[in-house]
C-alpha cells in the first residue's frame, strides 16, 4: 500500500469534516435532502444547494488528486451524494408541477413553488399563504448548479419528462426581472409584513441560471437534441438591464444587501460591468461589514435583542430600534474568500481567511464550526448604540450553519490548491466582466416584389426578393413566438410550454435550423398587425435605429446578429413609384457601414450563413409528443375545401398537399394568427377558383408564383409559403368616393354631422346610413360610424351592401385601413380608440417601466382621477384602468397607451433620461406636450390639440424625447408638405438657449373630460345647425378628435388663451425658466441627492407639510436615506400638488430647508409648512419688484396658487433668483429655532 501524500491526508481531514461532523451526517438516506439544523427538520431549497457544494468540490478534488483506488471510490461516493440531493430537490419540485404551469401565466405568490419541504417525504410542510414561498433566487440557484454540475460530468437528469420540467422551470424564472418575490431572506420588504418586492439577488441569480442552461444538454455526453435546454436571449438581457438599474441597491426597501455578493461574484457572476461590481462590493464593505462578518442589510431585526419573538411582523417605526445592533453573519466572509480566489486577489483571500478563523467555534475534537450569526448581548445594547462595533458579540442560531460551513470548506479547498476555478465553474461564468469583441450587425434587405426590387436597384441598392432567398424561409416574428410556445410541452405532466410573448430583437437576429431548413424572422416592429406605429415609415426607421443600437450593446452570442429587413409596398411614396425618403436615407446609411451608432454589414442572406448565429431548434424534431400540429389537421382538410369560407382556410389546404411538415405547421400557425379579409371581391372568384385548382396540383414554389402571375392574382406574396406580409383588405365602395379638398390636407374645421330625425323625433338611422354612403369626407364618415357604434352597437348591420360585410365594426375597420394608407394620424388614433385596437406591447411596456423602479400614473391629478400603477397588470386590467383615468375619452386613452410605449422604448435604450425620476405621470406629460405646441405655435388650444393628435408617431416620440431630455426645443409649422399630405407639417427641432421659445403661464390645474357632455351635444344637434366656417378660431369641439387633453383642459378650466400673445420682450429667453419648471414638475424631476437631504431634514423636525399633506418624521424610523421606498413616499406627498411649476417651486423650497440639516442644532421646529415659505418668498419678491417700479400688470398672480408669474420665470440663482427669496423666507419662518448668528440672511 502506498503511503498517503500530504495532499491526500489533508483531503481525508476535509472528508471527515464533511461526512462525520457537518453536512453528510445529516443527509436523509432516502430523499438525499438536508435538514436546516437539529431542531429544524425542514429542507430549504437554497440551503440544500449551497450546503452540498462542499461535497461536490470535495468529490472533484478526490477525482483530481486520487492517490489510490480508494480515493476514486471516495470521489464516486461523494459525487453520488450530490446527485442524490439534487434529485431529491427535483422530486420535491416536480410534485408541484401544477404550480409551475400556473405560475408561468400568473406570476402570483399563491402559485409559486414552495421554499421548503419535508426532509423525509419531499412533501410540502406549510400552506401556500403561510410562508413567503416565492423565492426566485432559490429556484435559480438550483438551476445554476444543475447546469454547472452537469457540465462537470454528473448525471442528474434521467428522462425526457424531467428535461421538459427543467425547461418549464426556465420559463418559471425567465420573468424574474418583472416579478416581485420575497427574496433570499424570505421576508420581502424589510418591514417583514409579507410584502413582496423586486430583488436584485433574484434577478441576478435568474440571469445567471438562464445563461448557464442555454443550449446545455442535460444528459451530458450521452444526450441528444431532445435533451437540450433552450433560453431566449431577450429574457436574459431584460434581467441584465434591470439588474444594472437596481445595483448597488438590493430592492425598494433595502439600499444595500450583503447577499449581492453572490450576484456580483461566485456563484452567479451576473454583472458584466466591472465598475458596478466594485461599487457594489464597496457599498457592502462600507455599510454592512463589522467585526464578526457582515449584516444582511441595514436595520435587520432578525435575532437582535430588540426583536419581539412573539410577533412575526415588525411595526414600521420599530425598524429604527435595530439600527447599529444588526446581527453579523460570518457567512459573507466566505463569499469574500471565494471572490478573492476567482479574481486572483490573494491579499483579500488571506485577510478574510484570517478573519474567519477568528470567529470559528471549535467543536468536539477541535472541529472548526461556522456559526450562523453573532448578536449583541441583551445587557449591552445601549453601549452598542452609542459606540457601534465595539461590544463583544455572542454566537447564535444554527451551529454549524451548513450553508456557511459548506462555502468555508469550498474556499479552503480552492485556496489550498485542491481545486482550480475552472473546475468549480466549468461553464466559465467567472469571465463575465471580460470585454466583449465589437459587434457588426449584418442586415439583409429584402424586397416584397420584383417592382420594389427594381425601384431599389434604380437607387443603387441591389437586393433580393422574398422568393429569391428560397430555400431560406422568411417569417414574421410572431411565428417565432408561436414556435417557442411548443417548447417544453408535455401532455403527461400537463405542461403547456412557453407562454406566448412578443419576440425581442435578439431572438429575431439569429438564424434558426428547423428540420434541416434555415429560417430567418423579421423584427417585431414591422408587423403591421400591431398598433398603428408600424404605419409610420419614420417610426420604422427610428425603431430600426433603436434595435441596431441595442444589438451592438447587448449581443453576447457566438456569431454576428443578422437582421432581415423587408421593404414592402407601405414603404413607398403615395405614387408607388419611389421609396419613402426616410427609408431610403436609412438604407444608404446602412450601406455606408454605420447607422444608429452601430457597425453595419449589408449583404445577401446566403452570404451571412457562415458568419451568423444559428440555433438548432431541436424541440421541433419528432419526439415523444408526436406531431407538432394538431392531429385532426389532415382530417379537417376535406371539410375546409368544401366549406364556403374557403379563403379563410386557404393556407391550411395548400399546405395539406405539401410534403414539408414544418411548412405546414408554420403556415397553419399563420392562418390562425393573421387577419383575414371579411369580403372576397366577387370579380376575382373565377380566378381564385382556378388558382385553388393549381394549388392542389403542385407544391413547387416557383410554379406557384408563375401560375399566380398568369392568373393575374394580386398580392402574390400572401400565398407564398413564407407568409411575411399581410394582404391589404379589399376596399369597400364606401371609401371609393373621391376625396374632397378637406381630406387632402388636415382640415382646420371639423364637420358637424346632422342627425336626421323621423316624425317621432327619434334618430332616423336609415337616413344616417344614406348620409354615410353619400359623404366624401373621411372625418364625417368616422363621425357617423362612431354615432352608429355608440347608439346601435359594433355588430349592427347597416345593410349598406347586399353581399354583406357592412356591420359597423367592419366599416370602421375598412375606414381604418383607408386612413392608414393616407397617414391621417388624427383619424387613425380616433378609429383605433373606437375599435379598441390592442397595443400588443402595452403590458410589456408597462412592466418594463415598473421593472426599472418607476411608478406610473395615468390621467391628470388630483387623485382619485389620477390612477397609480405600482405593479404589473394584465393587459385587460391595464386598459380598463387607463380608460377609467381618461374618463371615457378615447383619444386620451389611445394617446396614453402610445406615450407609455414610447417611454418604455427610451427606458430600455436611454435610462439616463429618467435619472432622479421615480414616478412617470403620463397625464401631465401629455398636458405639457399640448401646452408646448400651443405656446410654441402661438395658436389656440384647439389648434394645438389638433396638431398633437395629428402628429405622426415619430414626431410624437421626438417631442417626448425633447421634453424628457430637458433640452430647449422649438416647434414650428413647416412650409414643405409631409410625405402623406395629411398630417400637419409641424417640425420639432433642438435650439440653443438664446433661441429658446417663449412659454407663458398656463395655469392648468386639472383635466375635466367632457365625453358625456360632448356625446349628448352631438346626439342632440338640431337640423338647423350650420357647418362651421373655415377660420381656425371656429373649431367644432364636438368633433371626436378634440376629445384630447388640451381641448378638455381648455373647456374645463378656460386657462388656455384663444391665441397666444405675441412676444413683446426683447429677451428671447423670457418664459424659459417657467417652462423649465413646468417640465421638471410634470416629470417629477428633482436635483441629485434630493431625497437623502429630505431624510436629513426630517430628522430635525416633526414633518413637512405640503398643501395640507404631511410627510412625517416617523418615516425616517422605518426607512433609510437611500431606499427607493423613501423616495416614492416623498413623491406621493409632492404629487398632491396638481400644478407642475408650483410643485417645482415647492421642491426648491424644500431644497433650501435641507441646507439647515447641516447646522448643529437639535430641532428646527415642529411641522414645517413648505407652502408658507413659498408664499413668504413670493411676498418678498413682490415687495422688492414694486420698489423697483413694477406695476400690477407686470406682477400678475397665478389665480390657482397666488404666486407671481415672474417668480415662476426667475432663474434659481442671482440677486433676483428664487433661491435668494426662498432662503430669506426659510430663515424668517424658522428663525426662532436658529442661532442668532444665522438669522441675518443676506
UniProtKB/Swiss-Prot annotation:
Modified residues annotated as Phosphoserine in this record: 630, 731, 737, 740, 760, 813, 974, 983, 987, 1009, 1020, 1022, 1025, 1132
Tree of life domain: Eukaryota
UniProt region (Calmodulin-binding), positions on chain: 812-842, 1065-1105
Lipidated positions per record (S-farnesyl cysteine): 1239
Membrane topology, from the record: Lipid-anchor
Any single Gene Ontology cellular-component annotation: plasma membrane
Presence of keyword Endoplasmic reticulum: no
Primary localisation category: membrane
Pathway annotation: Glycan biosynthesis; glycogen metabolism
Post-translational events: Although the final Cys may be farnesylated, the terminal tripeptide is probably not removed, and the C-terminus is not methylated.
MF GO annotations: calmodulin binding; choline-phosphate cytidylyltransferase activity
Gene3D superfamilies named among the record's database cross-references: 1.50.10.10
Subcellular location: Cell membrane
Activity regulation: By phosphorylation of various serine residues and by calcium.
Cited InterPro entries: 6-hairpin_glycosidase_sf, 6hp_glycosidase-like_sf, GH15-like, KPBA/B_C, PHK_A/B_su
BP GO annotations: glycogen metabolic process; phosphatidylcholine biosynthetic process; positive regulation of glycogen catabolic process
Short name of one Pfam family: KPBB_C
Entry keywords, A to Z: Calmodulin-binding, Carbohydrate metabolism, Cell membrane, Glycogen metabolism, Lipoprotein, Membrane, Muscle protein, Phosphoprotein, Prenylation
Oligomer status and interactors: Hexadecamer of 4 heterotetramers, each composed of alpha, beta, gamma, and delta subunits. Alpha (PHKA1 or PHKA2) and beta (PHKB) are regulatory subunits, gamma (PHKG1 or PHKG2) is the catalytic subunit, and delta is calmodulin.
Role, per record: Phosphorylase b kinase catalyzes the phosphorylation of serine in certain substrates, including troponin I. The alpha chain may bind calmodulin.
Membership in a protein family: Belongs to the phosphorylase b kinase regulatory chain family.
Protein name: Phosphorylase b kinase regulatory subunit alpha, skeletal muscle isoform
Organism in which the protein naturally occurs: Rattus norvegicus
